[in-house]
Amino acid sequence: MKRVRAHLRIYGRVQGVGFRWSMSREARKLGVHGWVRNLPDGTVEAVIEGDPERVEALIGWAHQGPPLARVTRVEVKWEEPEGLEGFKVVG
């Protein structure tokens, strides 16, 4: 099975709105692996790996986020997969 890795930076009102926990739940539903964390500048960073279609689906979800979020921009950098397993909320 082909596996891809995306490094995301999510901008807007994305902290204090349940973004990380909602993304973790969505990732688990999709079978996507990786992690998500808040950064001091108010953005959210995530690294996600898995089947290309499932990773794209989670990127699509990140453009909306949970109901209280107001996402203004999502930056995506494609990287080489490293074999992450599970999905964690860190930081």
UniProtKB/Swiss-Prot annotation:
SUPFAM superfamilies linked to this entry: Acylphosphatase/BLUF domain-like
Cited InterPro entries: Acylphosphatase, Acylphosphatase-like_dom, Acylphosphatase-like_dom_sf, Acylphosphatase_CS
Catalytic activity: an acyl phosphate + H2O = a carboxylate + phosphate + H(+)
Pfam families cross-referenced by the UniProt entry: Acylphosphatase
First-level EC class: hydrolase
UniProt keyword list: Hydrolase
Protein name: Acylphosphatase
Provenance organism: Thermococcus kodakarensis (strain ATCC BAA-918 / JCM 12380 / KOD1) (Pyrococcus kodakaraensis (strain KOD1))
Phylogenetic classification of the source organism: Archaea, Methanobacteriati, Methanobacteriota, Thermococci, Thermococcales
